[in-house]
Amino acid sequence: MPLTPPPNPQKTYQIAILALGLVLLAFVLISDHSPKVGDHLHNLPFGGEYKDGTKSIKYFQRPNQHSLSKTLAKSHNTTIFLLILGLIVTLHGLHYFNNNRRVSSSLHCVLCQNKH
């Protein structure tokens, strides 16, 4: 059985845009943009305490916050800009594909239901 493309590929594009939007949203929610402290051997990204002979490091341990609230609290302008831009592009793409499908599937007036 040979593989054939779908007769209307717009549904495929709509799902791809939605999936890309979800991937971008997941990336923003999961990524950690907090500053890292310590050296390459003693990394304390969330605060804490380390003692070793002559070396003693103690950083404040922050309460566990959701990474989105940390991102917004730090106001990383690039992250916020990309999130808003991705949302706008996703909504525009969904609107475009929905309008195209509606026009191509029905050749009658939306207001009066007559063909013109």
From Swiss-Prot:
Give residue ranges on the Lumenal side: 33-77
Q: Which residues does UniProt assign to the signal peptide?
A: none
Ranges in the topological domain labelled Cytoplasmic? 1-11, 99-116
Q: Native species of this protein? A: White clover mosaic virus (strain M)
Q: Which residues cross the membrane?
A: 12-32, 78-98
Query: Which protein are we looking at?
Result: Movement protein TGB2
Q: Which InterPro entries match?
A: Plant_vir_prot
Highest taxon above the source species: Viruses
The record's subcellular location field reads:
Host endoplasmic reticulum membrane
Report the record's Gene Ontology biological process terms: transport of virus in host, cell to cell
Q: A GO CC term?
A: membrane
Further remark: TGBp1, TGBp2 and TGBp3 seem to act together for cell-to-cell propagation. TGBp1 is the main movement protein that physically cross the plasmodesma with the viral genome. TGBp2 and TGBp3 would facilitate TGBp1 function.
Listed A to Z, the keywords are:
Host endoplasmic reticulum, Host membrane, Membrane, Transmembrane, Transmembrane helix, Transport, Viral movement protein
Under the heading Pfam families, the entry gives:
Plant_vir_prot
Lineage, broadest ranks: Viruses, Riboviria, Orthornavirae, Kitrinoviricota, Alsuviricetes
Q: Which family does it belong to?
A: Belongs to the Tymovirales TGBp2 protein family.
